[in-house]
């Protein structure tokens, strides 16, 4: 039933006013068709209200589940964040950095000698450039076969 169509619903006012206002038949009783139509309408209205109540309960349960899921996700995030902070506080970041530097050193040791010589000259040049920038050291007399 549609809530927007009030003719299809039985209101308490209609029920109170119509309870004993059925037409009489020729035998002094109520008109059976009118009573049946009224009871059918009453039954449909009750079924409609029951469906609406069930829908409301389903929506309420879904809403509660949504918030319980949200709370579970937030608690997991808080736990993961605490674990991550513990890792960093225990030097996890330093361990990762140390492992990375060790990997780079291992790669450097495996390079052929000609590459290591070039890298040493580049390192020497960079040290001079850094000194020039920080201390103002003159690099015009820098002699190397690199250039």
From Swiss-Prot:
InterPro entries: AH/BAR_dom_sf (IPR027267), DivIVA_domain (IPR019933). This is Uncharacterized protein MG211. It comes from Mycoplasma genitalium (strain ATCC 33530 / DSM 19775 / NCTC 10195 / G37).
């Amino acid at each position: 039933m549609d809530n927007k169509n009030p003719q299809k619903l039985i209101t308490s006012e209609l029920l109170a006013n119509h309870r004993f206002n059925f037409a009489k038949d020729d035998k002094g009783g109520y008109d059976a068709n009118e009573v049946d139509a009224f009871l059918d309408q009453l039954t449909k209205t009750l079924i409609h209200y029951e469906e609406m109540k069930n829908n409301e309960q389903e929506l309420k349960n879904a809403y509660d589940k949504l918030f319980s899921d949200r709370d579970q996700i937030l608690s997991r995030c808080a736990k993961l964040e605490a674990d991550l902070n513990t890792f960093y506080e225990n030097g996890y970041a330093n361990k990762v950095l140390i492992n990375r530097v060790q990997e780079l050193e291992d790669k450097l040791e495996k390079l052929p000698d000609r590459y290591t010589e070039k890298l040493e000259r580049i390192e020497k040049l960079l040290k001079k450039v850094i000194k020039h920038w920080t201390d103002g050291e003159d690099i015009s007399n820098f002699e190397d076969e690199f250039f």
